[in-house]
């Protein structure tokens, strides 16, 4: 990348925690990187502020009713940035010459169409939208391979595995990969204690600065379950070769064990700017704004098995991976509805796995042979979960 024109980066989900971290890294390297496209869901004022700072060629607001506010706000600031709105325009930008790299950081299944559009267009895809892989992993990886798109994961765990696997020809030599989990803010609590957890407590992650949905997923261990499914698709590994360990310090991000007995691990401070810098500059390394890891000051590294009795979402994700087909899409959709209800105070913390399990067992799985099939399963799962929300027995 050195000596060439700057990489043109589209940041989808620019106002979220991952989007702002990506823009922080991009701004540190104006000779190498340029934020050429920025998108947001409905936070038009925040998007306008980012446009004033980064001056992209294009800005998009997903909520089309806010298009006039975006257009007029850009004009009022004297910016030449072109305004866009809606899902179709987002997909068009993802596949256009406006970018060669896409940071896919839109939360939830809403991020899937633009992620697929970027893959079809052969872009470098920095994948922070884990739902795209969980919902349509086979389709996404197949599409990327056919178009020559490069998928670089941004999750710290998958970035760690990516970096370890790129250290050698690992096509046949991997015995297993080990994803680490912080354990979330409620590690060590039993189900009785978890019943009283509030949304404010659940979004206060002990190590990472994240958005509310992914913070709750971390607290339930669903985040780790989704990452198991992601790892299966990203690295072509069967579920039997993917393990999980709880590591409360969040310094060892993942490990790869090889058949010769060697184990490689990637360590670093818990800051998403590190993995974003890896994805933006790979195979080069650039400064990310994150300091080095001082193991002496950290003192110790602890590991323990996950408690799937207290946190059954991890078990449910394993079940969905084993079932295959549309089961992961059903899992993901049910979880999105359940987490949203919890964050709105409609249900308790323990209702999240109860709702997900109810939907997984109620809805029959099918072969995931097309995007339409997957989206239909997603819609059905949401309907079943929303109906179950009215059932008091699930409101744990």
Swiss-Prot record:
Record-linked SUPFAM superfamilies: 1-deoxy-D-xylulose-5-phosphate reductoisomerase, C-terminal domain, Glyceraldehyde-3-phosphate dehydrogenase-like, C-terminal domain, NAD(P)-binding Rossmann-fold domains
Residues given in the record as 1-deoxy-D-xylulose 5-phosphate binding sites: 130, 156-157, 182, 205, 218, 223-224, 227
Binding-site list for NADPH: 15-18, 41, 129, 131, 211
Cofactor: Mg(2+); Mn(2+)
First and last residue of the signal peptide: none
PANTHER family (UniProt xref): 1-DEOXY-D-XYLULOSE 5-PHOSPHATE REDUCTOISOMERASE, 1-DEOXY-D-XYLULOSE 5-PHOSPHATE REDUCTOISOMERASE, CHLOROPLASTIC
Reactions that this protein is recorded to catalyse: 2-C-methyl-D-erythritol 4-phosphate + NADP(+) = 1-deoxy-D-xylulose 5-phosphate + NADPH + H(+)
BP terms from Gene Ontology: isopentenyl diphosphate biosynthetic process, methylerythritol 4-phosphate pathway involved in terpenoid biosynthetic process
A Pfam family it matches: DXPR_C
Annotated source species: Xanthomonas axonopodis pv. citri (strain 306)
Pathway membership: Isoprenoid biosynthesis; isopentenyl diphosphate biosynthesis via DXP pathway; isopentenyl diphosphate from 1-deoxy-D-xylulose 5-phosphate: step 1/6
Lineage: Bacteria, Pseudomonadati, Pseudomonadota, Gammaproteobacteria, Lysobacterales
Residues bound to Mn(2+): 155, 157, 227
Protein name in UniProt: 1-deoxy-D-xylulose 5-phosphate reductoisomerase
Highest rank taxon of the organism: Bacteria
Enzyme nomenclature, EC number: 1.1.1.267
């Amino acid at each position: 990348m050195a000596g060439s024109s700057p990489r043109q980066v589209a940041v989808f989900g620019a106002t979220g925690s991952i989007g702002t971290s990506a823009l922080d890294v991009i701004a540190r390297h104006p000779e190498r990187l340029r934020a050429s496209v920025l998108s947001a869901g409905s936070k038009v004022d925040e998007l306008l502020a980012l446009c004033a700072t980064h001056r992209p060629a294009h800005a998009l607001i997903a909520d089309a009713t806010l298009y006039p506010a975006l257009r007029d706000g850009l004009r009022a600031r004297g910016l030449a940035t072109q305004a866009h709105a809606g899902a179709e325009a987002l997909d068009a930008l993802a596949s256009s010459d406006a970018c060669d790299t896409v940071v896919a950081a839109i939360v939830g299944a809403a991020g899937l169409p633009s992620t697929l559009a970027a893959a079809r267009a052969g872009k470098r895809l920095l994948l922070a939208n884990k739902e795209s892989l969980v919902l349509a992993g086979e389709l996404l990886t197949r599409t990327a391979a056919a178009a020559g798109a490069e998928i670089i994961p941004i999750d710290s765990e998958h970035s760690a595995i990516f970096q370890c696997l790129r250290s050698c020809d690992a096509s046949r030599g991997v015995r297993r990969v080990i994803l680490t989990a912080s354990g979330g803010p409620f590690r060590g609590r039993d189900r009785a204690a978890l019943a009283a957890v509030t949304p404010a407590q659940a979004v206060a992650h002990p190590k990472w600065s994240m958005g509310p949905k992914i913070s709750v997923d971390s607290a339930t261990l669903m985040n780790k379950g989704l990452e198991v499914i992601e790892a299966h698709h990203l690295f072509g590994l069967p579920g039997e070769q993917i393990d999980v360990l709880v590591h409360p310090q969040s310094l060892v991000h993942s490990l790869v064990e090889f058949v010769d007995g060697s184990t490689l691990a990637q360590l670093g401070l818990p800051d998403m700017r590190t993995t974003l810098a890896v994805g933006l500059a790979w195979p080069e390394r650039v400064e990310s704004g994150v300091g080095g890891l001082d193991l002496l000051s950290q003192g110790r590294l602890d590991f323990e098995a996950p408690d799937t009795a207290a946190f059954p979402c991890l078990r449910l994700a394993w079940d969905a991976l084993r079932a295959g087909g549309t089961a992961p899409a059903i899992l993901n959709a049910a979880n999105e509805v359940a987490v949203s209800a919890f964050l709105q105070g409609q249900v308790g913390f323990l209702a999240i796995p109860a709702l997900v399990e109810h939907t997984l067992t109620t809805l029959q799985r099918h072969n995931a042979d097309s995007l339409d099939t997957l989206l239909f399963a997603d819609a059905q799962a949401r309907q079943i979960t929303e109906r179950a929300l009215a059932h008091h027995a699930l409101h744990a």
